[in-house]
Amino acid sequence: MELNVINTQGKAVGSLQVSDALFGREYNEALVHQVVTAFLANARSGNRAQLTRAEVKHSTKKPFRQKGTGNARAGMTSTPNRRGGGRAFPNKPDENFTQKVNRKMYRAGIATILSQLVRDERLIVVDDLSVASPKTKEFVGAVQPMGLEQALFITNELSENLYLSSRNLPNMLVIEAVQADPYSLLRFKKTVITRDAVKQLEEQWA
């Protein structure tokens, strides 16, 4: 398979022969769903927690007398059926959200996503991506000719200038090829990959 290569001005500068195993794979929706779901689940810190009725700071005083009020009897205000009381079955930090996906499936998922990006014309290959200084306006000026509103940029090596100049843009993300993940590839409208990063992705996933 052959992909067109452009420069940051949006002009064609040649083409690049790429692996069909990575960029020409058939789309498998079930596989993509499983890989993305597992990636997001494994990224969870698992630190959510609520208090039980024993852990809530409440007085153990009886809220009202046992008989004569017409209300159901009550012993304390920390019970789960009262406002401000503890949870009956609370979540605890030791909960494990890990989902196992073997390497073969994960590799196939990445290849499926990249192939679909090519078919949807959401993948752009550029010859190089660099900025002279760590300023946001430098990065915006470099990529503005390509007309990108929301994009993921993948480079073979993330320089300090490139990182610092792009980190303040909410709709742009610059990562190295080794950091590419299924969620980020699907999250952005466009994915811009440098020529060297394509080769690195092929070595890693093809």
Swiss-Prot record:
Domain of life assignment:
Bacteria
Question: What GO molecular-function term can you cite, just one?
Answer: structural constituent of ribosome
Q: Which InterPro entries match?
A: Ribosomal_uL4, Ribosomal_uL4-like, Ribosomal_uL4_dom_sf
User: Which Pfam family is one of those matched by this entry?
Assistant: Ribosomal_L4
Q: Give the residue ranges for region: Disordered.
A: 51-96
Which Gene3D superfamilies does the entry mention?
Answer: 3.40.1370.10
Q: Kindly list the GO CC terms recorded for this protein.
A: ribonucleoprotein complex; ribosome
Report the transmembrane regions from the record. Answer: none
One of this protein's GO BP terms? translation
What does the UniProt keyword field contain?
Ribonucleoprotein, Ribosomal protein, RNA-binding, rRNA-binding
Q: What does this protein do?
A: One of the primary rRNA binding proteins, this protein initially binds near the 5'-end of the 23S rRNA. It is important during the early stages of 50S assembly. It makes multiple contacts with different domains of the 23S rRNA in the assembled 50S subunit and ribosome. Forms part of the polypeptide exit tunnel.
Assembly with partners or alone = Part of the 50S ribosomal subunit.
What family is this? Answer: Belongs to the universal ribosomal protein uL4 family.
* The protein's name in its UniProt record: Large ribosomal subunit protein uL4
Q: Which organism is it from?
A: Chromobacterium violaceum (strain ATCC 12472 / DSM 30191 / JCM 1249 / CCUG 213 / NBRC 12614 / NCIMB 9131 / NCTC 9757 / MK)
- Gene that codes for this? rplD
